Amino acid sequence: MRRGRVWLAALCLAAGAAHADAIDTLKGFVAEVKTGRAAFTQTVTSPDGAKKKSSSGSFEFSRPNRFRFAYTKPYEQLIVSDGQKVWLHDPDLNQVTVRPVGQALGATPAALLAGASLEKDFELKALPDDGGLQWAQALPRVKEGSFQSLKVGFRGKTLAAVEIVDAFGQRSRLEFSQFEADAKLPADRFGFTPPAGADVIAQ
């Protein structure tokens, strides 16, 4: 009986260490990886799990608060931040929406991935390993109502996935591939000039 308890205690300690590693990995990612780029696939699932929509594209970031999400399939859309403003360009509508970066980010997934003040904006919680990934949950300290939960998955020290549940229960999962840490990214990757004739909406 004693051996069984010792084995169980050792198992619990090992699990606790793994969970701590997930938080340490997330902290290390934010503190040490100043730039990065990857391909991504995004799957959005309805609250009842019945409907799924998929899209794909590329993601680049340069801390603090500069990032570029370029959706290419099934249709093009660009979200880019130069550190001061966030631009959303929808080519099909020929429409651009622009917001100040502080207003647009707050405690959002983009702020988590490209920001620099992790523990100021988020409360961190270790989650069990799942699907071969180490997971850490990040809960916004200021409840803004845009999403219920956010978790980040790592394979080793490499960013592998982000899963978001929004305020309506809709689940979005981004899976990253070909991640390159500390990539050399030119500053103009995070600049944006609205196309001629585009309808620009400032918020």
Curated annotation (Swiss-Prot):
<keyword id="KW-0813">Transport</keyword>
<comment type="similarity">
    <text>Belongs to the LolA family.</text>
</comment>
<dbReference type="InterPro" id="IPR029046">
    <property type="entry name" value="LolA/LolB/LppX"/>
</dbReference>
<keyword id="KW-0653">Protein transport</keyword>
<keyword id="KW-0143">Chaperone</keyword>
<protein>
    <recommendedName>
        <fullName>Outer-membrane lipoprotein carrier protein</fullName>
    </recommendedName>
</protein>
<keyword id="KW-0732">Signal</keyword>
<dbReference type="GO" id="GO:0042953">
    <property type="term" value="P:lipoprotein transport"/>
</dbReference>
<dbReference type="InterPro" id="IPR004564">
    <property type="entry name" value="OM_lipoprot_carrier_LolA-like"/>
</dbReference>
<dbReference type="GO" id="GO:0042597">
    <property type="term" value="C:periplasmic space"/>
</dbReference>
<keyword id="KW-0574">Periplasm</keyword>
<comment type="function">
    <text>Participates in the translocation of lipoproteins from the inner membrane to the outer membrane. Only forms a complex with a lipoprotein if the residue after the N-terminal Cys is not an aspartate (The Asp acts as a targeting signal to indicate that the lipoprotein should stay in the inner membrane).</text>
</comment>
<dbReference type="InterPro" id="IPR018323">
    <property type="entry name" value="OM_lipoprot_carrier_LolA_Pbac"/>
</dbReference>
<dbReference type="Pfam" id="PF03548">
    <property type="entry name" value="LolA"/>
</dbReference>
<comment type="subunit">
    <text>Monomer.</text>
</comment>
<dbReference type="GO" id="GO:0044874">
    <property type="term" value="P:lipoprotein localization to outer membrane"/>
</dbReference>
<feature type="signal peptide">
    <location>
        <begin position="1"/>
        <end position="20"/>
    </location>
</feature>
